[in-house]
């Protein structure tokens, strides 16, 4: 069943949550915004003013001063719009790597924050509430044994966080209730934190992607393709963007008849066009052929028009992402696939990529073997049993086949799965990443995500479950995570071809869940417009593009005209340790890669300056020599001057 209303309560159900009061800190988290202004809370100011006279007045006030300072040290530095909701002292975090540690647990409107002053340096755990999948109580009031009474939070980013409370302290109930309230605001009729976040960045990331500019970059419109506004009010297809690129000889009225034959009205539309051959990548959903094998003359004519727009080939490939058995099964639900008898000069290829439920189960198995401990003796067999890398291989291999048909075969391709918003997005975006060097730049990749994932209706709200306590929802699936994993695999095989680094990819995934930014909220462009996200929330790209040096690959060399052909075999794929096992301190490199990147970037900039200086010097010498050679008077002048 479709869940079209799952975005309606993200930000407009209640009056906006209050901004930080004088009782809360209003400074920026160093993990998100190092340049924000830090301000003291009223409590900190008042404690300082009390302590001014305390030194000469009362031992009790000195104790109060020290207690206030300790409390201030234990509190998190808050983001603009963030405020503290609950705090519990004398809580024990059961760290699976370094053992139990006692400290203060704080719940804010944005994060779960634990800090212990018992270790040097202090132990800090900082997790956004958006990353929490579920919260469970452990033990009862009569539970015996140390640390047997508390809470466990299961997270979407592989982690499980376990906290022990003292039964007599009665803090567990309060923390549990506040976590359930603020980690799942949609389920409680509250706005997501993205609607409260008030940070201002130099660049507005919401303006990064302009579809007209992106299509113009590709040479669209041209004699074969046009931009239509038929979906301006999202009436043709409510999960497609307002602007669509379609064959120039197909009128808008005919598009409506094609839409009636495609699942959810998702007609074939252009994603990318080859600058030389004019071969295209188009995307859509499955045809509604059903068990009876229905046909649509308009749909057949439409695909013929796509093929005819490419004079280099008299054939078109239809890549169906599904296993063939699944595609056949979809006929019973009214769906199905294109018959080669009905579609002249079309070849149908099944790519055997499994559905969202298989992928969700695969990630669950992966989590079991990587967190909290890794069983060394059976590591390879355990990893194989998850089938995670096998799924990554099939996605990469499918995208590679698409890119190869377009580049080497100079043939246009049509890509779809069932509804065209999960596996289709994986395949088109990865193929475009292989074909077009622009998408391998930082801003180009952001445009790719905005275009192929966000504007074309990948259901982020349902797949991630932003602010929703229903952790067992069958619509949840790591589709976008798999795409980013595939991108990382490509960066490993082509380390100089991408302008962005690993930290860039991890940052995107962290904020896929965090609900700090509005970028990944809602299920479609239409829903984001209704929620007015560009006005009410901050874009993730605003944050990233304000500090590009953090996300830049120092090894990058511009290969804009190169097509990448990654090897999609199990021998060349590896588990992304930097993401899936990053919480294990034993897996961290001794030298932080992030700081090493910055050093290399600084060194590269220094060397580039020297190269430019030498080039200018050579140019000046060359100019001077040519002038002396061409002018006899100038040749004599130095001699006369010497005399």
From Swiss-Prot:
It comes from the Eukaryota. It is found in: Cytoplasm; Early endosome membrane; Cytoplasm, Perinuclear region; Cell projection, Axon. A 1,2-diacyl-sn-glycero-3-phospho-(1D-myo-inositol-3,5-bisphosphate) binds at residues 330, 355-356, 418-423, 459, 463. Pfam families: GRAM, Myotub-related. Expressed in sciatic nerve and in Schwann cells (at protein level). Detected in adult dorsal root ganglia, neurons of the central nervous system, motor neurons, cell soma and neurites of sensory neurons, olfactory bulb, cerebellum and hippocampus. Residues 593-627 form a coiled coil. It catalyses: a 1,2-diacyl-sn-glycero-3-phospho-(1D-myo-inositol-3,5-bisphosphate) + H2O = a 1,2-diacyl-sn-glycero-3-phospho-(1D-myo-inositol-5-phosphate) + phosphate; a 1,2-diacyl-sn-glycero-3-phospho-(1D-myo-inositol-3-phosphate) + H2O = a 1,2-diacyl-sn-glycero-3-phospho-(1D-myo-inositol) + phosphate; 1,2-dioctanoyl-sn-glycero-3-phospho-(1-D-myo-inositol-3-phosphate) + H2O = 1,2-dioctanoyl-sn-glycero-3-phospho-(1D-myo-inositol) + phosphate; 1,2-dioctanoyl-sn-glycero-3-phospho-(1D-myo-inositol-3,5-bisphosphate) + H2O = 1,2-dioctanoyl-sn-glycero-3-phospho-(1D-myo-inositol-5-phosphate) + phosphate. One of its GO terms (biological process) is phosphatidylinositol dephosphorylation. The active site is at 417 (phosphocysteine intermediate). GO terms for cellular component: axon; cytoplasm; cytosol; dendritic spine; early endosome membrane; nucleus; perinuclear region of cytoplasm; postsynaptic density. It is an enzyme of class 3 (hydrolase). Phosphorylation at Ser-58 decreases MTMR2 localization to endocytic vesicular structures. SUPFAM superfamilies: (Phosphotyrosine protein) phosphatases II (SSF52799), PH domain-like (SSF50729). Residues 1-52, 614-643 are annotated as: Disordered. GO terms for molecular function: identical protein binding; phosphatidylinositol phosphate phosphatase activity; phosphatidylinositol-3,5-bisphosphate 3-phosphatase activity; phosphatidylinositol-3-phosphate phosphatase activity. Residues 68-139 form the GRAM domain. Its EC number is 3.1.3.95. A 1,2-diacyl-sn-glycero-3-phospho-(1D-myo-inositol-3-phosphate) binds at residues 330, 355-356, 418-423, 463. Changing residue 103 to E: Severely impaired interaction with membranes and strongly reduced catalytic activity. Belongs to the protein-tyrosine phosphatase family. Non-receptor class myotubularin subfamily. Regulates the level of these phosphoinositides critical for various biological processes including autophagy initiation and autophagosome maturation. Homodimer (via coiled-coil domain). Heterotetramer consisting of one MTMR2 dimer and one SBF2/MTMR13 dimer; specifically in peripheral nerves stabilizes SBF2/MTMR13 at the membranes and increases MTMR2 catalytic activity towards phosphatidylinositol 3,5-bisphosphate and to a lesser extent towards phosphatidylinositol 3-phosphate. Heterodimer with SBF1/MTMR5; acts as an adapter for the phosphatase MTMR2 to regulate MTMR2 catalytic activity and subcellular location. Heterodimer with MTMR12. This is Phosphatidylinositol-3,5-bisphosphate 3-phosphatase MTMR2. It comes from Mus musculus. The lineage of its organism: Eukaryota, Metazoa, Chordata, Craniata, Vertebrata. The gene is Mtmr2.
